[in-house]
């Protein structure tokens, strides 16, 4: 499983695949 940070329009969150 890979987790990485996603930032969009000033909001960052963690996404895992």
Curated annotation (Swiss-Prot):
Tissue: Hemocytes.
Localization (cell): Secreted
Keyword Secreted: yes
Cysteines engaged in disulfide bonds, as pairs: 3-16, 7-12
PTM-bearing positions, type Arginine amide: 17
Record keywords: Amidation, Antibiotic, Antimicrobial, Disulfide bond, Secreted
Record flagged with keyword Nucleotide-binding: no
GO cellular component: extracellular region
GO BP annotations, alphabetical order: defense response to bacterium
Primary location group: secreted
Domain of life of the native organism: Eukaryota
Family, as annotated: Belongs to the tachyplesin/polyphemusin family.
Free-text function comment from the UniProt entry: Significantly inhibits the growth of Gram-negative and Gram-positive bacteria.
Protein name: Tachyplesin-3
């Amino acid at each position: 499983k890979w987790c990485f940070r996603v930032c969009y329009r000033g909001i960052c969150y963690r996404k895992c695949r």
